[in-house]
Amino acid sequence: MRSSCWLAALVVLGACGADDDAPPGDGDGGADVDAAAGTIDAPPVVGEPPGLEGIVNAHNAERALVGVGPLTWDPALAAIADAWVRQCVDNQAPTGLVDHNAGRSNGYPTYVGENIYGSGGQASGTGATASWVSEKQYYHHDTNSCDAGRVCGHYTQVVWRNTTKIGCAIYTCAGFQYGSTVVCDYGPGGNIGGQSPY
């Protein structure tokens, strides 16, 4: 008898876990992905600085579309990105955009990947992610290749299957053509030669 009562109680409690009438993502515990729109309805991520709100969820929406697991915010990666972007280094070309940080993996337990986005206006985390994801139109998963003359590496880093963590920073570098800059660092980093992102 006691076993039956406990079983009945568990069944009733289990049925109360989600509100079937609630709109997707409305407190039912999970993030909902609209595959057609490439959007995700999820709670904000703790740790994202002002101006970057939604960047992790934007990444995870795109990752869900290709069947790879979500990223989590990593304060250590965010600190690496923040320390770099605040230096406003543009020596490699110069291009009016912050250079990549060649030393970004120093002191971190894995190789660190990096995406950089710059805007002549005001950059945002979701705008940066949308720019990187826009490269997917040039990427061909079946041959793991990119159209000639096009860039796909930002997109492939966003969806890299072995990457599990992300940390980003936003800063405005005065005098740069694309001064409002978002830097995202990823661990473990992607774009490993000869490997497919997913």
Describe each PLM feature range.
Residues 120-198:
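Disulfide-stabilized extracellular recognition modules
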Residues 47-112:
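Short, well-ordered surface patches within globular domains
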Residues 13-48:
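Ser/Thr-rich, Pro/Gly/Ala-heavy low-complexity intrinsically disordered linkers and tails
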Residues 17, 35, 117, 169, ...:
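Residue-level detector of conserved, well-ordered beta-strand and adjacent loop positions
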Residues 1-14:
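Sec-dependent bacterial lipoprotein signal peptides
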Residues 71, 116, 158:
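Short clusters of hydrophobic/aromatic residues that line enzyme substrate/ligand-binding pockets
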Residues 103-119, 124-129:
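A solvent-exposed, acidic/Ser-Thr-rich amphipathic alpha-helical stretch
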Residues 56, 60, 82-86, 117, ...:
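Non-transmembrane alpha-helical segments in soluble domains
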